[in-house]
Amino acid sequence: ADDPIRYWRDKQGREMDFVLSRGRDVVHAIECKWSADALDGSALKAFRALYPKGQNYLVTPSANEAYQIRKSDMDITVCDLGSLLGLL
């Protein structure tokens, strides 16, 4: 069976748009923004403090092709929705 797509939010109000469990202790984090510049990284950093294993994705319509950025000491794959489906 496929693992469900979930949402994550902590008591401080930081949230991840989507989280996907992929095996034992591996959770992919997915944020959706209009542009890569809109990501501040604080929610992702808080999420990764609790769930350190997994890939980080930023989905934006402005990404013509997938590329990597580093923010808040984390590697993040920036891509559009079509590319994300291929990466997962």
Give the ranges of each region predicted by the language model:
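A cross-kingdom feature that marks ATP-driven nucleic-acid transaction machinery
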Residues: 1-88
